[in-house]
Regions:
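Conserved structured core elements
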Residues: 43-46, 59, 175, 208-219, ...
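Histidine-centered divalent-metal-coordination microenvironment in nucleic-acid enzymes
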Residues: 49, 181, 232-266, 353
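Helical (often loop-to-helix) elements that flank the catalytic cores of nucleotide-handling enzymes
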Residues: 252-322
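Signature for HUH/AEP ssDNA processing cores
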Residues: 53-55, 95-243
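Long, low-complexity, charged/polar intrinsically disordered accessory regions
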Residues: 1-88, 94-96, 101, 304-523
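Hydrophobic, Leu/Ile/Phe/Ala-enriched alpha-helical segments that form helix-helix packing faces
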Residues: 217-229, 265-277, 357
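Short helix/loop capping segments that flank catalytic or ligand/cofactor-binding pockets
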Residues: 57-60, 189-193, 260-262, 361-362
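Short, cationic low-complexity segments
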Residues: 206, 271-282, 380-388
């Protein structure tokens, strides 16, 4: 017989109730009353919370569908800064002036740097994007010439548009098709049933580095795509795992180019990783760098201070220096034309662009396939000591202090996403959407769904209360006022059943009204 608690979870999942809710205490500042509200966890993986993952999947489908064949230019309204943002920028300017004066006077800059960092954090929390300082020059210059082994790309004059070309049929019908593109990484060795035929000959090191930097290669492809197209190409892309556990890209593009041009762009796209070399292991086993306050990490054998991250990059300023790694796409490039509102477009959205969004990259590995499981384990071993970012502690293994080094770091103990087994090296976002895709953020799409429900129930989606009326506080575990999770789930299940019945009743009434109106017109 099943456990009662399991039945509760199953019923909650079937009704779309979050099974890992975050309890919050909501205080009404007007009446002084407080109540406990369960906020959905918002998980995107089905293994963590199926209802939240399904809800996010539906939002992504709507986002992809609305922007793919948009026939008008999206307009992003300018947002005026708030009073808080203006105040913080003014405060930032005053602190920067005082910090510069302290630097000229030879004073200690640490207090000023801490104050500036705190204001910068407040600016980010207020909703401002980017940095008030912009890009800080490092003094290092890198040649922008293309690699000699990369083919050149054509370049069209850019026009201010996000829409593709319009085609007209002989009978006068106008079409604005779009494209579906699939890009893969190169081969690292022969694969059979999702695992290498010869694991010893499989290039795990290259596979690991390609996975870690795959998002940068995608950025380069989009840059080249826009340069060749001549307009501001908009895209909705998802990064999915292949059976061989390597990431590949599905990209919905608004507008069209020829298949030959798409393949030419993919062949000419590359990304160079200009990081310090990792060919020579300096510290291994029990011999690891030691931390010294005010200095950083030292070589325990000689007492010498290890080169900092900036010093290691300065050593790459030599014209003869080679990048740590060069990424390219593989030969398998697929490009298809797609018309909006067709079954093919819906099929590509459901079965390619969003099919695996509720699963982690590692979940494509069949646990009942020992060869594939061993393949995943070998991939994890290859990633263990591979640096994933400038701040990765693995740089200590190769005699370089990571950027922003701090005590307690050690090779093989990086907590970055790329080193976690469920990501298999890919640390980036699974969904990549350009800013002018659907002219809506994911929050806007979520608000659309909420507005539809409220409208169906005959309620207003715009008549909101004072945003400052309620204050929200997280409830810590063990709070005596917090009911058990099972009890809270039962309450949410009852609420969901009541809401569904009410929604179905209003929909039925609306259908009857529409039917009656149709009958009157017909009469």
């Amino acid at each position: 017989m099943p456990l009662a608690r399991e039945v509760v979870d199953q019923l909650a999942i079937s009704l779309g109730v979050c099974i890992r809710p975050v309890p919050m205490r909501c205080l009404d500042t007007t009446t002084g009353s407080a109540r406990i509200v369960d906020i959905p966890c918002g998980a995107t993986l089905e293994s963590k919370c199926p209802p939240c993952a399904k809800r996010n999947l539906q939002l992504r489908k709507a986002q992809c569908r609305e922007g793919w064949h948009l026939d008008h230019e999206p307009v992003i309204p300018a947002t005026e800064p708030t009073d808080e943002q203006r105040y913080l920028v003014e405060l930032r300017a005053q602190l920067q002036a005082l910090r510069d004066q302290a630097e000229r006077d030879g004073e200690d800059l640490a207090p000023w740097d801490d104050a500036l960092a705190e204001v910068d954090a407040d600016l980010r929390r207020s909703g401002l994007r980017g940095s008030v300082l912009g890009r800080t020059p490092t003094g290092r210059r890198r040649s922008t010439r293309r690699r000699q082994d990369a083919p050149d790309l054509p370049k069209r004059k850019k026009v201010s548009s996000t829409l593709g070309r319009v085609y007209e049929s002989p009978d006068g019908q106008r079409f604005r098709p779009s494209m579906f593109i699939t890009l893969t990484l190169p081969s690292y060795g022969r694969i059979l049933d999702g695992a290498p035929v010869d694991p010893a000959a499989y290039d795990y090191r290259r596979a690991a580095r390609d996975a870690l930097h795959f998002s940068k290669l995608v950025d380069r492809f989009v840059q080249n795509l826009r340069r060749v197209a001549g307009w501001d190409v908009q895209y909705f892309a998802t990064v999915e795992p292949q059976k061989r556990l390597a990431p590949h890209l599905h990209l919905a593009m608004r507008g069209t180019l020829s298949r030959a041009e798409i393949k030419q762009i993919a062949a000419a796209t590359y990304h160079q990783v200009w990081w310090p070399p990792t060919d020579h292991v300096v510290f291994d086993g029990d011999t690891l760098p030691v931390w010294e306050d005010e200095v950083g990490y030292l070589d325990p054998r000689t007492g010498e201070v290890l080169p900092t991250w900036d010093q290691a990059l300065d050593a790459l300023a030599d014209e003869d220096a080679e990048p740590l790694h060069v990424l390219t796409f593989g030969n398998q490039v697929d490009a298809k034309g797609v018309l909006g509102g067709t079954e093919r477009a819906d099929h590509l959205i459901k079965h390619y662009l969003t099919k695996y969004l509720t699963k982690s990259i590692a979940e494509t590995c069949d646990p009942d396939n020992p060869r594939q499981k061993d393949h995943a384990d070998r991939m994890a071993d290859a990633l263990r000591y591979e640096p994933c970012s400038p701040t990765c502690p693995n740089w200590l293994r190769y005699g370089v202090q990571p950027k922003g080094a701090k005590p307690g770091q050690a090779p093989g103990q990086c907590r970055g996403k790329g080193h976690k087994p469920e990501h298999l090296g890919y640390p980036g976002r699974r969904v990549l959407v350009s800013r002018k895709w659907s002219n809506k953020t994911l929050t806007d799409h979520r608000a659309d769904r909420r507005a539809w429900v409220l409208e169906t129930l005959g309620l207003s989606a715009t008549a909101g209360t004072d945003p400052n009326r309620y204050t929200w506080r997280p409830i810590p575990p063990g709070d005596p006022d917090l009911p058990p999770l099972g009890q809270r789930l039962l309450i949410e299940i009852a609420n969901r059943q009541r809401w569904r019945a009410l929604l179905a009743e209003h929909q039925a009434q609306a259908d009857d009204t529409d039917l009656s109106a149709t009958e009157v017109v017909a009469a």
